[in-house]
Amino acid sequence: MIPVVALVGRPNVGKSTLFNRLTRTRDALVADYPGLTRDRKYGRAHLSGYEFIVVDTGGIDGTEEGIETHMAEQSMAAIEEADVVLFLTDARAGLTAADQAISEHLRRREKTTFVVANKVDGIDADSACAEFWALGLGEVYQMAAAQGRGVTNMIEYALAPYAEALGLNRDGDDEEEKEEREYTEEEAEAEQTRLQDLPIKLAVIGKPNVGKSTLTNRILGEERVVVYDAPGTTRDSIYIPMERDGREYVLIDTAGVRRRSKVNETVEKFSVIKTLKAVEDCNVVLLIVDAREGIAEQDLGLLGFALNAGRALVIAVNKWDGIDQDIKDRVKSELDRRLGFIDFARIHFISALHGTGVGHLFESVQEAYESATRRVSTSMLTRIMQMAQDDHQPPMVNGRRVKLKYAHAGGYNPPIVVVHGNQVKKLPDSYKRFMMNYYRRSLKVMGTPIQVRFQDGDNPFEGMNTKKLTVSQERRRKRMMTHIKDKK
């Protein structure tokens, strides 16, 4: 399971700066979908070979009363469920009463916590950081998040135990190698067969009170809920094996399956970290949206995370029954306007409470998974690349036309197409989006994002010295140049 790092601290100590530095390397995929913005509170990060989820908890003002009563429930849950807590302090401001109150709260939680003294640039860092040892949370790590100083070392140290325990990849170059890897036809077929035989992991996600629990109960059947109503840990979602129409599934329930008497609770506990971990671990995301509230910013944040993770996607607009036709028309119009950039995702209008439309969800889930694990040959991918190139020539870069040579499969779930050529990494984002959309239309991909990666081909003449002309060849060249000038 991917580890979670929570950033904790009073306001203005640099949590957002560190968050942006850690997550900015993962913005590229979200940028492929105009109209979708990255969530400012949580995101995926990749640094020094580690991949992890980072959460900016916020919500702590440091006062004793604030710790107990005014801290947002989201922040409490994030601290409780995180694997590692980075407790940020301000080295310039020194130790404050707010820092001491937060540290006392963290000590009571017995979390794996690292004290980070931020903003050490331009000051005597050792002297400034000495007083933070009084917090009683162990070693104090120095960092200047705005400049990036000390960030990599901090993450490496904090996540090293999880690398060993979870077998995480520590080789920073492996991701690039994975991108470049070309499947043989036999390997591609074997991988597809393996994926098709596995149960489909389906994560039901959505903001609070959209009906996740109701839908989960409807899918499982009321009589099965009690079976899975066992006390679980607060850190993990519930994994429920099930079968439908002869196909095996694992339903990842982020809300927690409850007894019938508890389903009608007005407030549903929402855990961001549970949701993000479920998205990382699943094959298909089922995003539930409330028809009465329309598309909220939190919906777009969850959607962006799912797309960034490359997950297949089905959208269910819940509570569709009992609303007027003019409201339905308005909701559909808003969906077209705000979700037009993910036209590959099926949208269903359902009532989880009454079961209307729920049965058809699994048709789209299976379609999305099959699209995400579909095998396409190198020859087909190269032919589509050539057709795209004929329809719309790549632009000139440094006075030379970018040339696309061939394409091959680079992975499944999500489908990855690797395009090789000359100077392809210098292609503008607009042309890369054109290629992504061209592949999606040509392959008739439904229910899953498709990733197109570009790999520059090696120049066989690079590094070779050009052969020097002989004296006679030099004279002949000069005579020819003079002759050309005279003709002009």
From Swiss-Prot:
One GO MF term attached to the UniProt entry: GTP binding
Record: residues binding GTP 2: 206-213, 253-257, 318-321
Any single biological process term in GO: ribosome biogenesis
Stretches assigned to the EngA-type G domain: 3-166, 200-373
Start-end of Acidic residues biased regions: 172-190
Region (Disordered): 168-192
Binding site for GTP 1: 9-16, 56-60, 118-121
Classification via InterPro entries: G_ENGA, GTP-bd, GTPase_Der, KH_dom-like, KH_dom-like_a/b, P-loop_NTPase, Small_GTP-bd
One Pfam family matching this protein: MMR_HSR1
Key word Transmembrane present: no
Keywords tagged on the record: GTP-binding, Nucleotide-binding, Repeat, Ribosome biogenesis
Keyword Zinc-finger in annotation: no
Sequence intervals crossing the membrane: none
Family: Belongs to the TRAFAC class TrmE-Era-EngA-EngB-Septin-like GTPase superfamily. EngA (Der) GTPase family.
Role this protein plays: GTPase that plays an essential role in the late steps of ribosome biogenesis.
Known partners and oligomeric status: Associates with the 50S ribosomal subunit.
Protein's name in the database: GTPase Der
Annotated source species: Shewanella woodyi (strain ATCC 51908 / MS32)
